[in-house]
């Protein structure tokens, strides 16, 4: 059986990991063993945070909608209930944008929700 020398494959594997670890601090970007662990951990954080980002943005939108609703004399939960009763289907992302950038339009939507609730 012939001897297998893995020089090319090992170097390619190391290069790939070190390329992914580029920009990391200290040994994490230079030493293969440490870099490999850092890259794996970074991947785990990225995977987790892609899911958390969705939760965090939804929480931010709800906070903005709540603030805008309270300025117009309604709580967040009452506003959402009113919008559902009025069959107004605007998602929270758009509502939050209206609450921040288009206060008049948001106020009009809140008034429609109030009218249905009253």
UniProtKB/Swiss-Prot annotation:
Stored InterPro entries: Ribosomal_bL20, RIBOSOMAL_L20_CS, Ribosomal_protein_bL20_C
Keyword annotations of the record: Ribonucleoprotein, Ribosomal protein, RNA-binding, rRNA-binding
UniProt record, GO biological process: ribosomal large subunit assembly; translation
Entry GO CC: ribonucleoprotein complex; ribosome
Signal sequence, start to end: none
UniProt-listed SUPFAM superfamilies: Ribosomal protein L20
Superkingdom of origin organism: Bacteria
Cross-referenced Gene3D superfamilies: 6.10.160.10, Ribosomal protein L20
One MF term in the entry's GO annotations: structural constituent of ribosome
HAMAP family referenced in this protein's UniProt entry, alphabetically: Ribosomal_bL20 (MF_00382)
NCBIfam families found in the cross-reference section: rplT_bact
Family from the record: Belongs to the bacterial ribosomal protein bL20 family.
Protein function: Binds directly to 23S ribosomal RNA and is necessary for the in vitro assembly process of the 50S ribosomal subunit. It is not involved in the protein synthesizing functions of that subunit.
Protein name: Large ribosomal subunit protein bL20
Origin species: Ectopseudomonas mendocina (strain ymp)
């Amino acid at each position: 059986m012939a001897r297998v020398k893995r020089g090319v494959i090992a170097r390619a594997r190391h290069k790939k990991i070190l390329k992914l670890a580029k920009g990391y601090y200290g040994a994490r970007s230079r030493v293969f063993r440490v870099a490999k662990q850092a890259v794996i951990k970074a991947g785990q954080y990225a995977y987790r945070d892609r899911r958390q980002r969705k939760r965090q943005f939804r929480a931010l939108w709800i906070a903005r909608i709540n603030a805008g609703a309270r300025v117009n004399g309604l709580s967040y939960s009452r506003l959402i209930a009113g919008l559902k009763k009025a069959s107004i289907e605007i998602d929270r992302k758009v509502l939050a944008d209206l609450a921040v950038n288009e206060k008049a339009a948001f106020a009009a939507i809140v008034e429609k929700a109030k009218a249905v609730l009253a």
